[in-house]
Regions:
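SAM-dependent methyltransferases
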Residues: 1-4, 10-23, 63, 130, ...
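Hydrophobic, well-ordered beta-alpha structural blocks that scaffold small-molecule cofactor pockets
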Residues: 1-59, 73-77
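Alpha-helix N-cap/loop-to-helix initiation residues
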Residues: 10, 71-74, 98, 125
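Short phosphate-binding/catalytic loops that engage adenosine nucleotides
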Residues: 22, 86, 110
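Hydrophobic/aromatic beta-strand patches that form the interior of the parallel beta-sheet core
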Residues: 25-27, 45, 63-65, 90, ...
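ADP-ribose/adenylate-binding Rossmann-like module
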Residues: 63, 68, 79-104
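Adenosine-phosphate binding glycine-rich loop
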Residues: 92-153
Length: 153
């Protein structure tokens, strides 16, 4: 699982996913978030600029979750994710935020935006980091099962 973002939402989902047995690759431009993730024993990749993202290798078993509220990071990270094979691509935020995000992606010439889940999570409108993490992980598990059942058929 690849999770990009900053703050409590990033930390909560990364920790929960790790406990659930996922191999987590957390990406953040925020030094404080990076330090929190490292203290939790998570693999952290420090993002320095949205114009020079590290190479990725998302495969059909990878979920990519965006835990940002910043279009300067969202557009390049989602463009990159959409170029890969991740079975799930999702972004935190309200329906209004998702509409703004999709509009920004279209203006940037990004295709296949229908692959982006948003708002993320099985339980709508989660306001705390732990609840959002649980709701998001549940959605990822459901999507993984559905995706791989379709692939096997």
């Amino acid at each position: 699982m690849r999770i990009a973002g900053k703050g409590a939402d990033l930390l909560a989902l990364s920790r929960l996913a790790q406990v659930a047995g996922y191999r987590v690759r957390a990406q953040t431009p925020d030094a404080e978030s990076a330090a929190d993730l490292q203290r939790a024993g998570l693999c952290v990749e420090h993002l320095t600029t949205s114009n020079d993202l590290p190479e990725i290798e998302d495969d059909p078993y990878t979920a990519f979750v965006l835990m940002f509220h910043d279009l300067d990071w969202e557009v390049p990270l989602l463009r990159q994710a959409l170029e890969g094979d991740a079975y799930y691509i999702g972004a935190v935020g309200s329906s209004r935020a998702q509409s703004s995000r999709l509009e920004a992606l279209q203006l940037a010439g990004v295709k296949n935006t229908d692959r982006i889940h948003g708002p993320i999570g099985l339980v709508p409108s989660m306001r705390n980091a732990s609840g959002l993490a649980i709701s998001t992980l549940a959605e990822l598990l459901s999507e993984l099962q559905t995706h791989h059942l379709k692939a096997a058929a």
